[in-house]
């Protein structure tokens, strides 16, 4: 196990993603067992729990580009979940649409974290990639 600030940050993000996935599951369990409720719940359940699993995949990436790719999948899934949560509020598909507000705020924060992580990893990748040389 790593020590220091980067290890704490990694653990914090993993823990946040675990809490986020838990909140998504709890929300979808409270949605109505109607055709629309089931459809939206299933979609949010998939996209809202995916960042937890894909972040784990990113930690075991086979290359820097694989790492960035997996982070981008997390970002894509978070953006999809945000749209689903907004739909839950708009319809509404739960008794109190305001219950979704904390999840939307956390989704926005996680999106910002992943955008920053992707930028940092991409810059690092560009710095560490040696310039290609062509021999004639």
What does each model-found stretch correspond to?
Residues 1-136:
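Amphipathic alpha-helical assembly/interaction segments
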């Amino acid at each position: 196990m790593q020590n220091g600030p980067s290890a704490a940050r990694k653990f914090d993000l993993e823990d946040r993603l675990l809490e986020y996935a838990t909140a998504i599951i709890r929300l979808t369990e409270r949605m109505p067992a109607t055709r629309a409720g089931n459809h939206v719940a299933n979609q949010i359940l998939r996209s809202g729990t995916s960042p937890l699993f894909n972040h784990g995949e990113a930690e075991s990436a086979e290359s820097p580009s694989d790492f960035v790719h997996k982070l981008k999948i997390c970002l894509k899934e978070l953006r999809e979940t945000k749209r689903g949560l907004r739909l839950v509020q708009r319809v509404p598909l739960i008794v109190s649409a305001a219950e979704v507000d904390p999840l939307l705020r956390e989704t926005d924060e996680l999106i910002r974290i992943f955008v920053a992580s992707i930028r940092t990893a991409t810059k690092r990748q560009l710095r560490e990639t040696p310039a290609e040389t062509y021999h004639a």
